[in-house]
Amino acid sequence: MPDTQELQYTGFEQIPVENLNPLVSRQMIWGERTMLARIVLRKGAVVPEHHHENEQMTYIVEGALRFTMGDGRVITVGAGQVLVIPSNLPHSAVAIEDTLDLDIFTPPRADWIAGTDTYLRR
């Protein structure tokens, strides 16, 4: 993916699938200021607690994720629903069904681009 601003036109079938662990895979595309990630989580997949400077929007295409926020709130997000997570709010998630989600980040996740997101690779 480019490091500079340029026009991109593609489909997810052309974006490589990155298998992060046996239960989670993702595809990513990004521009100068925004990243879109297509994430597949099998039932029981766990995204450990983490936080990031990036604002995050999670849209559940199918399935459901149960998020636990650093302040103790538990929010179940199902198909057709969107969760907006502000910058630096600790959060974790569990796939309570096989789930397809689209995550939007601004700015793009530098750790994902560099492959240094070890919390997801366990």
Regions found by a protein language model. Give the residues of each.
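A cytosolic small-molecule/anion-sensing beta-strand core signal
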Residues: 61-62, 78-79, 97
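Structural motif
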Residues: 35, 57, 64-66, 90, ...
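Short acidic-glycine-tyrosine-enriched beta hairpin
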Residues: 71-87
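A short, N-terminal "cap"/entry segment at the start of jelly-roll beta-barrel domains
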Residues: 1-37, 116-122
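Ligand-binding loop in jelly-roll beta-barrel domains
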Residues: 87-111
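Short, conserved beta-strand element in jelly-roll/cupin
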Residues: 41-42, 52-67
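Conserved short histidine dyad/triad with adjacent acidic residue
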Residues: 35-51
